[in-house]
Structures are given as C-alpha cells and as structure tokens.
Amino acid sequence: MKPRSMTLMMLRRRGAFSGCVPLAVVYLLGAAAAAQQPAASAPAPSAAQAPGRGRGPQPVDSRVQIRMHHFAEMNEDIPYALFVSSKVRKDKRAPMIVTLHGIGGTHTTMMRPNAIDLAEAGGYILLAPMGYNPRGWYGAPAPRGRRGAPPAPNQAPNAAAAIPAPNGAAAVPAAPPNTAAAPPQGRRGALPPGLLNNPNDPPNLRELSEKETLEVIDLVRKEFKVDDHRTYLMGHSMGGAGTLYLAIKYPQRWAAVAALAPAAFTVDREGLGKIPKMPIMLVHGDMDTVVPVTVGRAWAEAMKSVPMKTYQYIEVPGGDHGTVIGSHQAEIFAFFAKHSR
C-alpha cells in the first residue's frame, strides 16, 4: 500500500523571515547511479539507457527523443532529452515542463514512464537538459566538502519547531529557517570518485551548467510554440537545488516549480522573499539518508515565514531519496495544472 503523504498548503499567510543557508558537507546521489556525460563526438543513441538506482541501466521510454545541440561557448555537443505530447500542435501554444536530474544523473534520468504518461495526457512538452555535465548544479552554489568528510557543525537541533498543518492534520516537525542538517555519515563509497569534484571540470562549471540549461530551454521554445505563461520547472536532489536557484533568479520564466528532495544546502532561502507569488511544491521522504528531511522542512518553514502566496510541502512517510521521484509525479503535474503566469 502506498504510504499516505502529509501535505501542507499555505495560502496568503502573513509573516516574515530572514536568514541564509549555512554551508554543509554532502554526499549527493541523484535519482540514478552515477553516469558520465556522453562524449561530444559520439552520436546520441536512439534508445538510450537511463541509469537506475541499484537496478542497473534502465531503457529510456521509446517515446523520448534523445537529441544533441552545439554549446558554442565550449565548442561541445551536449545531449538533451525531449518528449512532445501528441496533443501539441505547431500552431497552438503548448505548456512545457523542464526537469532537472540529480548529481551523477543524465538528461534521461528524469524521463520516467509515469512522467511521460502524464505529459502525454496533459498535452505537455517535457524537456530534460544535461546541465553541461552530471555535476554542474545548474548554477546553484555547490556544497563544499568531499566524500568521507565529517558533517558540518550546524546540525539542526533535535527539538525542532513544528509547521502547523491545516484541517487538524498532524504537525510536521521543522528545522528552523536558518538551519539545515548535514547528511549523516556512513555513505562512504556511495559515489564514484570524481563525481563531486572532478579536476577536469572547468573552473566556471556552475556558470556553464546554468547557461547550457537556459540555452536548451530557449532552443526548444524557438522550435515549438511554447506557452510562456505555462512553463514549469522541477528537479530532484542537485536538480531540486537547481530548481529553487533558477526559480529565484529567473522568476519571469516559470509559472510554478517543484523540488524533490532538494539538495539545497547552500541555496540562500532569503531569496524566497523576492518571489512571494511563485507557486512552489516540495516533496521529501522522511527516511532520506542522502539529503536529510530537515532540509526540506527548513525550506517549508522559510516559505511559510515569507509568506509565500501558495506553496505545498509533502513529506512522505518511509520515503527515501530516490523513490520520491516517481511516487509523486501525479501530484506535481496536478499542482502545475492549477497555475499559470
């Protein structure tokens, strides 16, 4: 039986918050096992393999297009994945969802069959950029540290405050807005060497990741008649951090965003004060051992304190870091369908 989710919806709340996110040491694992970026000179396969966490490579849905585009700044060809609903017409504006993978993932990681089914039913274009390489963070500030390093000292206190839940539902414990726990130890070896810090990466990797992501989005916008009032952003882990970062930096691009188990240890939550009208959904499993649930709770508390006009926080009992990707796609698509810019 699918575990029930605890959902918090905050509408037109009053309040204020302040604070910034402290640095944290993090062992990040995306939705998938680590996968390296395809070589620029190699042609994209027609049936790519999406990495699956602990289950080996998983075949990408045949409805997904694997494409390449030329990233002129680095003179490289970078892959991206695209699904276009059969309901999309060239002469009619279509909604688009951009989905960002976690660290070690690829452009195919988030192209899950249930997401494709929902995109087909809703008439969406579903776009998954690479973000230049598997660890670019889409421009978001990357957590400092290395594998095996001890957690940062700014752990969330055990006696955390609680986010009040409406309609008599159980309150969800929350870390204070200025606190985000570092991931627990014990995951040494979970990530291949060089995944977090690769000496071959360019020094401006984060900048390149952000630019390449936006370039692909604009490329698809030019090819199709994308509805700028119904363009959405979602991401998992590193991609969740990228989602929150890009939402704050480019609010004019998105009608709503969703972050799944966001590894947003070093994304400044004060930035939410700049986008109080942006609809945001957060999903986090309470058994996540990669990005602790205290991170999601801290962001939920910050959104309540802004106050955000509309946000939704779903904490999944028994949910781990990877399962939240597929388990709440329907809720995310339903949330997006309610909002336009």
Where do the protein language model's features map onto the residues?
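C-terminal catalytic histidine-bearing segment of alpha/beta-hydrolase fold enzymes
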Residues: 281-283, 289, 293-341
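N-terminal secretory signal peptides that target proteins for export/translocation
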Residues: 1-14
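Serine-hydrolase catalytic machinery in alpha/beta-hydrolase-like enzymes
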Residues: 73-81, 87, 91-225
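A domain-start/cap signature at the N-terminus of enzymes
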Residues: 36-96, 155, 165-166, 175-183, ...
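Primarily recognizes the serine-hydrolase "nucleophile elbow" in alpha/beta-hydrolase
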Residues: 110, 221-223, 229-276
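Loop/turn elements at helix/coil->beta-strand transitions in domains of secreted/extracellular proteins
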Residues: 93-96, 122-126, 227-230, 252-256, ...
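Bacterial N-terminal signal peptides
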Residues: 18-31
